[in-house]
């Protein structure tokens, strides 16, 4: 379900907002989509807990689902920031990330973050997907 809260025809929220959180899954601002921190969830919005590889791939799929309503895919991602619970997982995370991101050309930052709760990983993203003509 897509809950679009509009400020204008080119600036609006994307995705169903959790009523307990003060932000939306993503926000469109012109030709860019800013994706809030996402964690590994399945299609039914249930948390996935597994290896760093499983959680990395699941988090990328979560991002893909968030941006799909705007016609965007992971190949449209231009920047990802990853928050790892433990940087000792970096090598395994990096391998899974490369597998999951495909041929996207992007910038990336990865940092250790102890505030990541009940998961090994969280990612936010910036997506470039021009608005269709006439919007």
Language model regions located:
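N-terminal presequence-like segments and the immediate start of the first folded domain
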Residues: 1-61, 65-78, 84-135
